[in-house]
Amino acid sequence: MHLNMLKSKIHRATVVQADLNYVGSITIDRNLMDKANILEYEKVEIANINNGARFETYVIAGEAGSGIICLNGAAARCAQAGDKVIIMCYCSLTPEEASEHRPKVVFVNDDNSISNVTEYEKHGTIG
């Protein structure tokens, strides 16, 4: 048996751009991807804090240090510039692996610069 567990997330990122005419995906600043251990073309789930929408797409790397969070193609219908989003990535673990697993949580400022990185998530203890 394998369990689907949170691998990592980028918390409260600000959408900088939404490009309906691009082929698809979400463009994420390479620095944020690296800190969150998210790979290019990896599947992610995105929760829009402003409107409650949740959707899935894949990641393409944006310029390191640019702060870019851009929803492309159909995903651009799910958020607009200025919206806050949570970008989550999951992994499949055995129960034994899951018992020791700690997700990487990357917190960002309004300009999508990194403010804090943790390796656990408990209600009321991080932020």
Curated annotation (Swiss-Prot):
* Swiss-Prot/TrEMBL cofactor(s): pyruvate
Q: Which domain of life is it from?
A: Bacteria
The record's GO CC annotations read: cytosol
Arranged from A to Z, the UniProt key words for this protein are: Autocatalytic cleavage, Cytoplasm, Decarboxylase, Lyase, Pantothenate biosynthesis, Pyruvate, Schiff base, Zymogen
Annotated metabolic or biological route of this protein: Cofactor biosynthesis; (R)-pantothenate biosynthesis; beta-alanine from L-aspartate: step 1/1
Q: How is the cofactor bound?
A: Binds 1 pyruvoyl group covalently per subunit.
Q: Which GO terms describe its molecular function?
A: aspartate 1-decarboxylase activity
Q: Where does substrate bind?
A: T57, G73, A74, A75
The record, for Pfam families, names: Asp_decarbox
Which terms under GO biological process does the entry name? alanine biosynthetic process; pantothenate biosynthetic process
Q: Where in the cell is it found?
A: Cytoplasm
Main localisation: cytoplasm
- Give residue numbers for the modification (Pyruvic acid (Ser)): S25
Active-site positions on this chain: S25 (schiff-base intermediate with substrate), Y58 (proton donor)
Q: Does the keyword Phosphoprotein apply?
A: no
Give EC number(s), comma-separated.
4.1.1.11
Catalytic reactions of this protein: L-aspartate + H(+) = beta-alanine + CO2
Q: How is it modified after translation?
A: Is synthesized initially as an inactive proenzyme, which is activated by self-cleavage at a specific serine bond to produce a beta-subunit with a hydroxyl group at its C-terminus and an alpha-subunit with a pyruvoyl group at its N-terminus.
Transmembrane ranges?
none
The record ties this protein, via InterPro entries, to: Asp_de-COase-like_dom_sf, Asp_decarbox
Top class in the EC scheme: lyase
Free-text function comment from the UniProt entry: Catalyzes the pyruvoyl-dependent decarboxylation of aspartate to produce beta-alanine.
Tell me, how does this one assemble? Answer: Heterooctamer of four alpha and four beta subunits.
Q: What is this protein called?
A: Aspartate 1-decarboxylase
Organism, by scientific name, is Clostridium acetobutylicum (strain ATCC 824 / DSM 792 / JCM 1419 / IAM 19013 / LMG 5710 / NBRC 13948 / NRRL B-527 / VKM B-1787 / 2291 / W)
